[in-house]
């Protein structure tokens, strides 16, 4: 382990002591918000520090065993050699764990998300595929015990969605689904195809961290135009006689959000504002990502939603993630919501690249 990493771990140990002292301060205890924040930090730092202290202890044992090699007693030297081998194995394992523990954390990982799926090239087949993608995320969310709520949707003429926007809430949603942003391509024979020809269609997926408190995004009310209109069902059929649907336009950016799936104008307005805030936050963070490491841009995308990230090939039962050249012949399983087979390799790839960068510092 290089000196810069050791220095970072020593700083974490010092910080843990500081937090421990602050948590016993009566003023901090009486401040619920500050006490909660520090308690979470303490809980995060404690296991890292415990591993670090264990690492230092084994490092001292290794140094002691290496000194014994200079002894004349062959039996003691043999025991020392065995001790050195075992200790090096333990240190190697602890080294990797500690490095992973200090990798840069994405501040959005614990957030809920706003997911937007839009049909792209391919007409009706693209709309049907967008519906299939929504089913994948719905089933995966169910397996993760997350909650999914549709905010807005536009039904395709032959099924699926021209566009669907939803909120997914639960534990660490963004950390697992953030890799889904980009263009998803499907190759299959449409049900309407009489010649049995394979068609290629595409959809775009946008994953945005949800803004828990809209006030954290500075939206000037004078920069927002709010219009109301009657909500419509499939085929343009009015589903109510009041102007419950809401369209919000953010004038500086030209961002437009519509919401009509809620039962009231108040709920639709709140949901539309939530989506707007998430889009603005996402745009700000996409800008920041341009200045970050190539690893992050490569895996999560540089903001270009048209970047093709994945192909679903039905005739071959194959799914390919182009970012890490991963090909799996588990299409049916993944379409049933078993996304972990793709998400885990993406996380491992990101961590591997981060570890490489860390080792080079």
Curated annotation (Swiss-Prot):
Major localization class: cytoplasm
Keywords in alphabetical order: Cytoplasm, Methylation, Protein biosynthesis
InterPro entries according to UniProt: PCRF (IPR005139), Pep_chain_release_fac_I (IPR000352), Pep_chain_release_fac_I_sf (IPR045853), Prokaryotic/Mito_RF (IPR050057), RF-1 (IPR004373)
Signal peptide: none
Disordered: region residues: 283-307
Domain of life, source organism: Bacteria
Entries under SMART domains matching the protein: PCRF
One annotated GO molecular function: translation release factor activity, codon specific
One term under GO cellular component: cytoplasm
Post-translational modification: Methylated by PrmC. Methylation increases the termination efficiency of RF1.
Residues bearing PTM N5-methylglutamine: 237
Compartment list: Cytoplasm
Purpose of the protein: Peptide chain release factor 1 directs the termination of translation in response to the peptide chain termination codons UAG and UAA.
Family in the record: Belongs to the prokaryotic/mitochondrial release factor family.
Protein name: Peptide chain release factor 1
Gene transcribed to yield this protein: prfA
């Amino acid at each position: 382990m290089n000196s810069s990493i050791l220095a970072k771990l020593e700083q974490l140990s010092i910080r843990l002591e500081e937090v421990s002292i602050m948590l016993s301060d009566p003023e901090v205890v009486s401040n619920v918000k500050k006490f909660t924040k520090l308690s979470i930090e303490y809980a995060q730092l404690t296991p890292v520090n415990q591993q670090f202290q264990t690492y230092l202890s084994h490092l001292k044992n290794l140094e002691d065993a290496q000194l014994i090699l200079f002894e004349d007693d062959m039996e003691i030297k043999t025991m020392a050699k065995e001790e050195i081998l075992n200790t090096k194995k333990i240190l190697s394992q602890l080294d990797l764990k500690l490095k992973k523990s200090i990798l840069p954390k994405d501040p959005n990982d614990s957030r809920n998300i706003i997911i937007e799926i839009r049909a792209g090239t391919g007409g009706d087949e693209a709309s049907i595929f967008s519906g299939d993608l929504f089913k994948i995320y719905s089933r995966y969310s169910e397996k993760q015990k997350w909650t999914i709520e549709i905010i807005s949707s536009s039904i395709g003429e032959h099924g699926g969605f021209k566009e669907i926007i939803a909120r997914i809430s639960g534990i660490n949603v963004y950390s697992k689904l953030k890799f889904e942003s980009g263009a998803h391509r499907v190759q299959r024979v449409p049900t309407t195809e009489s010649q049995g020809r394979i068609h290629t269609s595409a959809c775009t997926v946008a994953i945005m961290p949800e803004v828990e408190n809209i006030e954290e995004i500075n939206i000037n009310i004078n920069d927002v135009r709010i219009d109301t209109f009657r909500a419509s069902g499939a085929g343009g059929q009015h589903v109510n006689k009041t102007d419950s649907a809401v369209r919000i336009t953010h004038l500086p950016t030209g961002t437009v959000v519509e919401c009509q799936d809620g039962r009231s104008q108040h709920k639709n307005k709140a949901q539309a504002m939530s989506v707007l805030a998430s889009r603005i936050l996402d745009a700000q963070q996409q800008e920041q990502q341009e200045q970050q490491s190539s690893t992050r841009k490569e895996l999560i995308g540089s903001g270009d939603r048209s970047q093709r990230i994945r192909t679903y090939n039905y005739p071959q039962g194959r799914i390919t993630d182009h970012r890490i050249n991963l090909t799996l012949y588990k299409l049916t399983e993944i379409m049933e919501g078993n996304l972990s087979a793709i998400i885990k390799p993406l996380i491992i790839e990101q961590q591997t690249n981060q570890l490489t960068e860390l080792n080079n510092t």
